[in-house]
Amino acid sequence: MDRLEIAIGHQLGDLTIDLELGVDPGQTVALLGPSGAGKSSVLRAIAGLLQPARGQVHLGAHHWFDAAEGINLSPDERSVGLVFQDYALFPHMTVLENVEFASADAAPEILSRFGVGELARAMPSSLSGGERQRVALARALARDPDVLLLDEPLSALDTITRREVRAELAGLLAEVPVPTIVVTHDPVDAADLADNVAVMDGGKIVQVGTLSELRGSPQHITVERILGPAESDER
């Protein structure tokens, strides 16, 4: 397994994306920030859905993107598993067929691994929020990706379902051996799903650390706005 390294710059309208980030194998990093901070654009750049104006995206010694060298692998050439906020399952396919779309050989085993093997013949419309998430994650991992990217995976759920699914997803991500990035605007999601949190604002990462570190010593006004002021040792 290799470390993911991102150092990109890009202009999107009035937003200037300029950041560096590294994610180790088996580590989950949350990109936490307000809407419009550029979080999802970072995922798109990693996946090859957005070509930055400058910078690099490397996975170990493998160069997925390097503006100076003229390297820009297509999305199909990058080993990335993607899970979007609406889970994007094919509605006309069964659960098994959805996962087989990524890998026919791996589908039965990975459905069983994620606890939804008995739903193989079910249609997506009949699934609960947690079941849909498990199937989407199974499909993303069926192709044995080297990087896993999740874009607001819990935002479409109601409060009660969100709490239950968050706990399930945290357990699943703890077993994923590849670099993983989760985009979220919710500090609770970030705390439960990620090892480290990178707070973004205005296209830049303004502070990185565990949630307790960020809460204990916020270094940017956006960190304070999201997490509150530094906690006092006094009682």
Please provide the spans of the model-predicted regions.
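Conserved H-loop
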Residues: 177-183
